[in-house]
Amino acid sequence: MLRKISLLLLPVFVAINLVHSSPEIMKNLSNNFGKAMDQCKDELSLPDSVVADLYNFWKDDYVMTDRLAGCAINCLATKLDVVDPDGNLHHGNAKDFAMKHGADETMAQQLVDIIHGCEKSAPPNDDKCMKTIDVAMCFKKEIHKLNWVPNMDLVIGEVLAEV
């Protein structure tokens, strides 16, 4: 279940395509991002509270605070090779991943730039998981400003269809 809910988080590390509907691309990217979630859930012994955090992430007024949710995002990003060993976005790999899953070059770069800006604006934190929470919340805010939030009904529908 956690793997399925994590599908909602791909946009934290990938981009959008102008040719297609941005929410549709976000949905596609989310579906691909979560493929490593079962491994991360097992490796980190993630509780159900993390599932709730990931499920609620895109709600406009929801604030994710559970450190383990940040750890889950880090695990996924590491498995997909979109972050460097320090936990920072690997610009080239993240852009390539986004383009592989439907984003055009311009939008992939735009999202990489947003994430990079969020990394720079997040307060210093030696805890990688909490730093990821700060970056993710900043990113979510920017995605809401652009009206690129994926349609949750469509995401959940596709997740359930895969079960």
UniProtKB/Swiss-Prot annotation:
Keywords: Disulfide bond, Pheromone response, Pheromone-binding, Signal, Transport
A Pfam family recorded for this sequence: PBP_GOBP
UniProt KW Transport keyword: yes
Keyword Coiled coil assigned: no
Entries under SMART domains matching the protein: PhBP
GO BP term, example: response to pheromone
Tissue: Antenna.
Signal peptide: 1-21
Self-association state and partner proteins as the record states: Homodimer.
Known function: This major soluble protein in olfactory sensilla of male moths might serve to solubilize the extremely hydrophobic pheromone molecules and to transport pheromone through the aqueous lymph to receptors located on olfactory cilia.
Name of this protein: Pheromone-binding protein
Organism expressing this protein natively: Antheraea polyphemus
